Amino acid sequence: MTAQIIDGKAIAQSIRTKLSEKVTARKEAGQRVPGLAVILVGADPASQVYVGSKRKACEEVGFISRSYDLETNCTEDELLNLIDSLNDDPTIDGILVQLPLPAHIEDSKVIERIRPDKDVDGFHPYNVGRLAQRIPVLRSCTPMGIMTLIKSTGVDTYGLDAVVVGASNIVGRPMTLELLLAGCTTTTCHRFTKNLEQKIRQADLVVVAVGKPGFIPGEWIKPGAIVIDVGINRLDNGTLVGDVQYEAAAQNASFITPVPGGVGPMTIASLLENTLYAAEQYHD
């Protein structure tokens, strides 16, 4: 068996095209164009790349894109005051603060300062809680994008045994909630997990988000399983690879996401979907 590739790049482009059409329809109906504010603190190269991609995608679909680049040594209060002003700005539907933040700024304080109805990253405790209660509104972008990828396979998720490797607040934990909502029996693995191989060998669906190149051997993958690889790791030779050993995994899986071109584009597409959702549901 050779796995079918889940083409995140193509699916994300399809979503962006639909969003662009919706923005055009809003304009023609005399409605406001959605607005997204993106805040970058410092000059971390990876963060600059991510932020640049988000701003470009925003403009591609016709959203208003506002950029705020703050110095690494900006104070926590300066950042919180900027968020307060954007919370009160009626032209802004979504506020995104690129993580990680410098050590002197507390992530949780910043995330909780963003109004829940403008939290298009889906990180605010209110929005995570809504997902936990099975009534999601603004959902965490990467898990939301992954659910779109899984849906594209046509596989019925109800009753599947799913394993999530990684328990971060950004991916692993909300991913577990998304899979529960989709009817999976879900196991979340982390650094204290015993018998990881055994758990993965039994899984119908595997989502890996640990940030370690080739962490999961491909031969662990159960024949016919769906493999979602969230990792994006740059090797010394410049090659980008995922957290799963791709070639071997593709021999066992029924569907697999490539790296790059799998989950990454979907995270940004989901961010744009959340921004339009916020405009329509909360701010029109």
Swiss-Prot record:
EC number of the protein: 1.5.1.5, 3.5.4.9
CDD domains (alphabetical): NAD_bind_m-THF_DH_Cyclohyd (cd01080)
Pfam hit, one: THF_DHG_CYH_C
InterPro entries: Aminoacid_DH-like_N_sf (IPR046346), NAD(P)-bd_dom_sf (IPR036291), THF_DH/CycHdrlase (IPR000672), THF_DH/CycHdrlase_cat_dom (IPR020630), THF_DH/CycHdrlase_CS (IPR020867), THF_DH/CycHdrlase_NAD-bd_dom (IPR020631)
Summary of subunit composition and partner proteins: Homodimer.
Family label: Belongs to the tetrahydrofolate dehydrogenase/cyclohydrolase family.
NCBIfam families on file: PRK10792.1, PRK14186.1
Chain's role: Catalyzes the oxidation of 5,10-methylenetetrahydrofolate to 5,10-methenyltetrahydrofolate and then the hydrolysis of 5,10-methenyltetrahydrofolate to 10-formyltetrahydrofolate.
Name assigned to this protein: Bifunctional protein FolD
Organism: Shewanella putrefaciens (strain CN-32 / ATCC BAA-453)
